[in-house]
């Protein structure tokens, strides 16, 4: 079944059937104030911290038909008739679930718009968080599309969460005793609803207000639903009364409902209402907080400002290729998702629920996320990298995650196991790749000299030591160099990128070995550019040493092993019953360069990726490993808690798929690289969504593989490193436009069937208009480049500081 379609001209995905397999969401605002809105109007919002400053109550585990966080009701009747005779509908369809004539939910660039027709009315609702503000604005335009006058009340409703999101679910005594929701009469005659937990009354109050006076209001869920809450969200019994109670709630399950009398709307007439949900500093500041977003002009200006931001953001990379789904994702939806993962890390989504103050921002997650936004928002990327570097330990390792408000860091799940190491071996290395990408993109080499403290502090909370960004990077690789095991390979620690494989202390990681190799290569390249011969020699030596160890110890005959356990036995070997072959063991041996052994193609690199194609590749994506473990094994850890074919246990874990795509481009196989891309492109799944279920406009984290009965089912969309890496694989390796220290490298690897493509790329103050022709049906290899009318040698375009420059290239 088709649930919607892409409208690239408007930068929207248009949902036309509200009965999607799961909730499809869109993000609004930022971590400072924002969250997500689902396609039927529900919202999950917070200010600053979803764990400790939650605003709306949204429980994803409840059925899709349930009200979640926010909605609105329209009470429609003939003029002069009673409320009991009215038809009650929702512009969002949920929770009323009544008959509708048409439904559109337009998922845009950090806004969502609904255009629905029902009960003789056309609703046009726009929801977004204005840039720089701390309010969710919803503008309702209600048009009488019938041929008779209709009397209409609009009743927007918000259900509040306790600020402590976890306690909202786990403490049914303390939470309701602390909650208050009260009507506040404003000087201009409007009514605002102020809701708060008692202990936050003087510094964190949630407010719901409209731009017109309310006829009545409600603050208590029990009264609103009616009949001791045996009334339902589908048809609250209080809406059968002429007015709501206008009583305050001094405990219980608090809501805000405003009865807004739109009067009698004539045929063809439109009435507008603007509502806002915000958080202000205390009950005394409610009046002052309700002065904005009163007029259509204000909303229009704020919406234009939001769209202008996305105009700028999306203008940095614009592509046109023979593949429409590739164009749609790369020009619109993939960049938006990269922005979202950079903003939210893995903090708050339909699946990452944001409970518990120890989750916060992941070190490895956000290091990779920055790489997907450096081109568009380099200053914000740098700011995040500085925060990440500040939670690096003096020994070069990194804390696994941190709270962005308090900057308190933790070691993650490793602290739950007394007998396992309390660090993740890959964490600290990712920042080397991120900083290197930032330097190549911006040329901001002064960043290397910025002093940033390490995490450890004295009793007065002062840093024990600080170092330059360069010193932080050097310590990251030095930590790996100094922590190796029986085979001379990096110790696994509690885990590497694959959090769920938790082998006993002493295990070694081939993933970390290869990531270390890539990090060393980046540092060596940087040293060469800066003329630092001594450090270049050091890093080159470490690289050669690790490359030798990997090839001497980890080649299994047809592929590379993935781990060595604490006893020195291989994991990811043909000799194993389960987990014989692991994707990351192969792709990363190519990415690091370790698999080449002096060759640019073929050899172990080609053999390893051939094993991936033979054993791991499915038509819906590449599996993380094969075959899946069939039973819990405490020596392996969390990977064996999943059934075969799910998540890390032989599932199609999407994050590593772009690493395989990059590996294939490095081997020169553009057809295979793009084939792998297409298999996981959600836009290409639009016509098979009943199987896939997740949003077709963003990447999921995982898809159940062919080892699972529900092969093809996707989950955990939006907040996934898949987004950043697919974006990099697409722009830097398939299209082949890579910023380097000395210039802009043009090195495409595309399907042979493509006759060419164009890219407009903004970098370091200049615009490059790149046109690539492919007359001979090649995948890789530049035969000729002409820059501003002059042919250049090689494929490295020199940097320009300004202006627009034409680049004409021919493959062959």
Model-derived regions, located:
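Aromatic-rich carbohydrate-recognition surfaces in CAZymes
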Residues: 361-366, 370-381, 385-486, 509-513, ...
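Active-site acid/base region of carbohydrate-active enzymes
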Residues: 97-99, 321-332, 379, 383-397, ...
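Non-catalytic C-terminal accessory modules of carbohydrate-active enzymes
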Residues: 47, 51-121, 614-615, 643-649, ...
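Extended, loop-rich substrate-binding clefts of extracytoplasmic carbohydrate-active enzymes
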Residues: 80-135, 231-258, 331-335, 339
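Beta-strand-rich N-terminal accessory domains
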Residues: 1-68, 190, 203, 278, ...
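Catalytic cores of carbohydrate-active enzymes
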Residues: 155-157, 171-174, 399-401, 515-637, ...
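Polysaccharide-binding surfaces and accessory modules of carbohydrate-active proteins
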Residues: 63, 112-114, 125-239, 289-316
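Short Pro-Gly-centered flexible turn/kink motifs
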Residues: 31, 150, 263-281, 516-519
């Amino acid at each position: 079944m088709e649930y919607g379609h892409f409208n690239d001209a408007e930068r929207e995905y248009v949902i036309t059937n509200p009965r999607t397999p799961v909730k499809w969401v869109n993000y609004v605002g930022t971590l400072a104030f924002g969250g997500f809105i689902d396609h039927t109007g529900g919202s999950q919002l917070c200010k600053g911290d979803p764990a400790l400053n939650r605003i709306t109550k949204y429980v994803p585990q409840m059925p899709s038909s349930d009200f979640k966080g926010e909605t609105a009701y329209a009470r429609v009747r003939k003029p002069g008739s009673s409320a009991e005779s009215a038809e009650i509908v929702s512009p969002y369809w949920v929770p009323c679930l009544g008959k509708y004539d048409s439904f559109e939910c337009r998922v845009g660039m950090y806004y969502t718009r609904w255009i629905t027709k029902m009960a003789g009315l056309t609703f046009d609702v726009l929801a977004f968080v204005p840039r720089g503000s701390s309010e969710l604005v919803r503008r309702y335009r209600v048009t009488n599309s019938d041929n008779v006058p209709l009397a209409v009340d609009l009743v927007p409703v918000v259900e509040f969460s306790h600020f402590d999101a976890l306690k909202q679910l786990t403490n049914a005594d303390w939470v309701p005793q602390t909650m208050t929701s009260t009507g506040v009469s404003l000087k201009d005659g409007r009514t605002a609803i102020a809701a708060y937990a008692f202990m936050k009354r003087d510094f964190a109050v949630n407010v719901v207000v409209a731009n017109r006076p309310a006829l009545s209001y409600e603050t208590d869920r029990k009264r609103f639903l009616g009949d001791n809450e045996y009334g339902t969200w589908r048809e609250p019994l209080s809406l059968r009364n002429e007015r709501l109670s206008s009583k305050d709630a001094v405990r219980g399950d608090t809501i805000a409902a405003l009865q807004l009398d739109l009067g009698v709307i004539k045929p063809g007439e439109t009435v507008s209402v603007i509502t806002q949900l915000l958080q202000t500093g205390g009950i005394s500041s409610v009046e002052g907080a309700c002065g904005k977003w009163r007029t259509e002009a204000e909303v229009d200006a704020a919406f234009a400002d939001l769209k202008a931001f996305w105009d700028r953001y999306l203008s940095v990379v614009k592509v046109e290729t023979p593949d429409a789904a590739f164009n749609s994702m790369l020009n619109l939806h993939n960049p938006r998702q990269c922005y979202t993962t950079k903003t939210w890390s893995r903090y708050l989504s339909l699946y990452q629920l944001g409970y518990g103050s120890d989750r916060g921002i992941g070190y490895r997650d956000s290091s990779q996320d920055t790489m997907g936004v450096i081109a568009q928002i380099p200053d914000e990327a740098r700011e995040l990298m500085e925060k990440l570097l500040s939670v690096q330990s003096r020994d070069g390792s990194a804390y696994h995650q941190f709270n962005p408000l308090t900057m308190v860091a933790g070691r993650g799940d490793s602290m739950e196991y007394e007998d396992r190491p309390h660090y993740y071996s890959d964490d600290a290395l990712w920042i080397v790749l991120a900083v290197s990408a930032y330097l190549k993109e911006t040329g901001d080499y002064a960043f290397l000299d910025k002093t940033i403290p390490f995490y450890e502090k004295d009793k007065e909370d002062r840093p024990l030591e600080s170092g330059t960004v360069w010193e932080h990077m050097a310590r990251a690789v030095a930590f790996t160099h100094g922590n190796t095991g029986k085979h001379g390979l990096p110790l696994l620690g509690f885990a590497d990128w694959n959090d769920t494989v938790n082998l006993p202390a002493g295990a070694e990681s081939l993933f970390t070995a290869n990531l270390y190799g890539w990090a060393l290569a980046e540092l060596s390249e940087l040293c060469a550019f800066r003329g630092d011969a001594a450090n270049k020699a050091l890093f080159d030596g470490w690289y050669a040493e690790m490359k030798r160890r990997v090839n001497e110890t980890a080649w299994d005959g047809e592929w590379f092993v993935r781990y060595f356990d604490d006893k020195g036995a291989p994991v990811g070997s043909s000799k194993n019953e389960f987990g014989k072959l692991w994707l990351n063991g192969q792709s990363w041996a190519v990415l690091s360069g370790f698999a080449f052994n002096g060759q640019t193609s073929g050899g172990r690199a080609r053999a390893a990726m051939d094993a991936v194609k033979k054993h791991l590749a499915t038509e819906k994506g590449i599996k993380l490993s094969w075959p899946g473990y069939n039973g819990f094994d405490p020596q392996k850890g969390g990977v064996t808690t999943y059934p075969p074919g799910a998540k890390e246990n032989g599932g199609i874990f999407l994050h590593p798929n772009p690493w395989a795509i990059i590996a294939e481009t490095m081997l020169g196989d553009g057809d295979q690289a793009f084939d792998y891309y297409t298999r996981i492109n959600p836009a290409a799944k639009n016509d098979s969504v009943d199987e896939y279920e997740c949003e077709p406009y963003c990447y999921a984290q995982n898809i159940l593989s062919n080892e699972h009965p529900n092969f093809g089912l996707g989950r955990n969309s939006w907040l996934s490193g898949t987004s950043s890496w697919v974006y990099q694989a697409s722009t830097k390796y398939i299209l082949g436009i890579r910023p380097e220290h000395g210039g802009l490298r043009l090195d495409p690897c595309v399907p042979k069937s493509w006759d060419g493509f164009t890219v407009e790329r903004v970098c370091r103050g200049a615009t490059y208009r790149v046109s690539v022709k492919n007359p001979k049906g090649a995948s890789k290899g530049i035969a000729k480049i002409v820059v501003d009318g002059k042919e250049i040698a090689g494929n490295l375009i020199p940097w320009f500081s300004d202006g627009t420059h034409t680049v004409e290239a021919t493959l062959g």
